[in-house]
Amino acid sequence: MALSVANVGLDCEDVWRVANFWSAALGQSVDEGSSEAFASIGGANVQRTQPAWFFHKVPEPATTKNRVHVDLIDPGENRVARLVDLGARVIEEHDIGVHSWTVMEDPEGHVFCVAAKVYTG
């Protein structure tokens, strides 16, 4: 049987800061019962069609770039500006002709990419 993605987990120094950023970015509420030690988005929805997001408190700051990142799609014209307004930072932009995307960091430095459409190769 093949694996499927259940959750996206992020280690955080400030759980609320990161969870609130992703809540606004994804347009979903932080789950009831979330705390300073652990928060989630979509975790309470047992019939979800997308992975839930989990935010785990850790005592130490990240010291290296994360080796896995999330690629997100937003067809809206202002996708990058909206995320910057929420607290993200642009790292670099890429355009290979048939596909373009922006590499960004959330307020605590978790790297992610955003594009207007899914890259199909």
What residue ranges belong to the model's regions?
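Vicinal oxygen chelate
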Residues: V15, V70-E108
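Short acidic/glycine-enriched loop/turn segments that link adjacent beta-strands
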Residues: S35-F38, T64, I96-S100
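Domain-length accessory/inserted modules outside core catalytic folds
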Residues: S40-R48, A52-K65, L72-D74
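Charge-dense, helix-prone N-terminal extensions
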Residues: A24-S29, R48, A62, N78, ...
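Active-site beta-strand termini and strand-to-loop segments that position acidic
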Residues: I41-V46, M104-P107, K117
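Core segments of cupin and vicinal oxygen chelate
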Residues: A2, G9-A52, D85
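A short acidic/small-residue loop/turn micro-motif
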Residues: V98, V118-G121
